[in-house]
Amino acid sequence: MTRKNNLPSEPTDALGFITRGNAYSRNGAYEQAIDSYTKAVELQDDLADAYFNRGVSYYELGEFQLAISDLSRAIDINPYDDNYYGRRSLAYIFADEPDLAQADQDRCEELRN
C-alpha cells in the first residue's frame, strides 16, 4: 500500500475503504470520509463500523438525522456496542429528541456495566 499525505492508496475491498475513511476523518475531511464509508457499505452492507463511522462523520458535519440513521443501522447490526448508543444519544440531543437521547444513554450505561 503506497501512501501519499498519510492516506492509503485506492482500496479494493470494504475494509480498505473503512481504513481510508478513517484517515480522512482523522484529518477532518468528513465529506471524503463519508464517500469512503459509503463505498464500504456498497461492497459489504453488514459492517457496523462503516455505518458507525459514517454516522460520526455526518454528526461532525451537523447532519444529525443522517447521523441517527447510520448509527441506528450500526446498532441493528451490532446491538452490543455501547459506543454506538452513546454517539446516537448525542445526535438525538442535537436533533432535539431528549427522550430518545436518554433512552440511548441508559442503554449505553447498561452495556458498560
Residue ranges and their predicted role:
Residues 1-113:
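Alpha-helical tetratricopeptide repeat
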